[in-house]
Amino acid sequence: MAGKKAAKVPRDTYERELLRLQTELVRLQEWVRSEGARLVVVFEGRDAAGKGGTIKRVTEHLNPRVARIAALPKPTERERTQWYFQRYVEHLPAAGEIVLFDRSWYNRAGVEHVMGFCTGKEHQLFLRQCPVFERMLLEDGILLRKYWFSVSDAEQQERFRRRLEDPVRRWKLSPMDLESITRWEAYSRAKDEMLVHTDIAEAPWYVVESDDKRRARLNMIAHLLATVPYHEVPPPVLELPERPPSTGYERPPRDLRTYVPDHAASL
């Protein structure tokens, strides 16, 4: 990162602003649903750059029937014989939907290229076709936002170390993650080449500096909200009805049901 390193965002400031932004995300969601809009948000970046944590905060208060996450596994043997973009197309949103890609078709420009999972010819074909593919999405009316989460090598190393020592997050660390440490510069070159070919005027890349996770989350969400032309949709007027009087119903005896043990009482 260039320039003086910014101070970390205090927790109380972060939580207050995050809640405000999440409230706006709900308004964005209701606009998407009301207008029949289609929104695609691409999250890319190195391992441990903060993509997943940001996605979690984006979707925390959203309706999963409107906003969903697409995190595709490695392609099957059948998918490997298809047009490269084909398996991503089926995850694109219909009217009134938001799709967040936790990694995306840009796998071919990054991990597949660096790790040798695709040929040089396939990689170059991707770089040529990707802008065309994205322009097709835009011409069809899809709103597309692409974010690259940029983490320093020192911060990535520290996050890997914490994952290694944390039994709750240990599953996040894979042999591929560890391999990325020794291929840092190869990934850097791949990222630079990707940006040269795919940072197009119609669908630019937005870089999120992410050594400070709180700052990265706030900055990314605020930018998304600022670049989508949504407006507040008045919610329907709802009133709670009065509960009707009992008609004599009685619950069956408790011993006829199997209840989970009260583990909390033992704490």
Residue ranges and their predicted role:
Residues 1-267:
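Glycine-rich phosphate-binding loop of ATP-dependent small-molecule kinases
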